[in-house]
Amino acid sequence: MLDIRALRQDGEAIKAALSKRGYTLDLEEFAALDAKRKQADMRSQELQADRKKASKQVGELIKSGMAVDEAKAQVADALQTIDTELDKEVASAKAIQDEIREYLMGIPNVPQEAVPAGNDEDDNVEVRRWGTPKTLPFEPKDHVDIGEALEGGLDFERAAKLSGARFAVMSGGLARMHRALIDFMLDIHSDEHGYQEVYVPFLVGPEALRGTGQLPKFAEDLFKIEGERELYLIPTAEVPVTNLAADEILEANTMPRRYTCHTPCFRSEAGSHGRDTRGMIRQHQFEKVELVQMVRPEESDAALEALTGHAEAILQKLDLPYRVVILCGGDLGFSSSKTYDIEVWLPSQQCYREISSCSNFRDYQSRRMQARWRNPETGKPELVHTLNGSALAVGRTLVAILENYQNDDGSVTVPEALRPYMRGLERLK
């Protein structure tokens, strides 16, 4: 959520910055709401002054010799009228404040200056590449053909029988590799990158989703649970992990906070009809290892570079070629101020496909969820900056391994880094 004071002072500059996203900020609507708020505040102040004046009259009447009960009775009607009007104005002011908050909740984050202009993913800018795409001495198969031919392997038919489209069943060595990837990623981030592993609920309330920016704008992308309580299946571990700091003041000596977490993720993919309908690239349920950081404001830009490097390290250890792109304004996520996508090479498609997004949200999420830290220089609470990134999406990493490590006999070589997690298994057959 944007700072309302910044909107009042620099509305035109913010409007210009948001245009990089293709978003038009309605400053007239904001000005009208803010004027209503001021009017309600002024009316409340006037009524409070009237009440104070009426109460003072009671004292003056008593001083003039009137009995206490008689003095109170004389101004009772006036006080009652004032109190009734004051209650109405307080309720009106709250309604206006709620309206302003909803207006602010619907405004995306301001892109950083480094974010390139552009409309969609075609305008994203490549930053760097690592590794050389493998040239296979045979026609590469896609991960579906490879996985379905493995012993056990992938089974989309039974998954559809259970749950419909965009689900998968894995068994045998493939299921073990999927689990091995999760353990491998968590170990690297915990042991080498200094993240604290956390376990969180997979169901959250609406306020948690509002805090990170999924609600109210993206309700159609979520799975909501039917029952007495309003709960949602998490679309990413970002939601519960970032909200660990909601309504808290973090002490400076506990900063930065770095968390890594494995969760299943659930998405309706409402806007993805017809895209990646084959295989595991885009599913309603998938696993992800997430990185979340909460840092001092002056540290967040450097933290994004480090976090992105931590995600890249997984691909490097697995020897999977990839590239990093910076997202243009039109492709930037709603809550993000700057995002790097990491894209892994898929031989069957002869292109790079997204496997991770790493974002700096600055104080956009922390203002929504009131996540603060105590600045030792001022002694006052200030908003933290939040960041997160996929490190990595487990299913897509599995897809990349199947395709990049495939052999002409249909088997798949197990990457050396994973073999300790696979009981020494060197090949899936």
UniProtKB/Swiss-Prot annotation:
Domain of life: Bacteria
Molecular functions (GO terms): ATP binding; serine-tRNA ligase activity
Entry EC no(s): 6.1.1.11
Pathway annotation from the record: Aminoacyl-tRNA biosynthesis; selenocysteinyl-tRNA(Sec) biosynthesis; L-seryl-tRNA(Sec) from L-serine and tRNA(Sec): step 1/1
Subunit: Homodimer. The tRNA molecule binds across the dimer.
Entry note about domains: Consists of two distinct domains, a catalytic core and a N-terminal extension that is involved in tRNA binding.
Protein name in the entry: Serine--tRNA ligase
Gene name of the encoded protein: serS
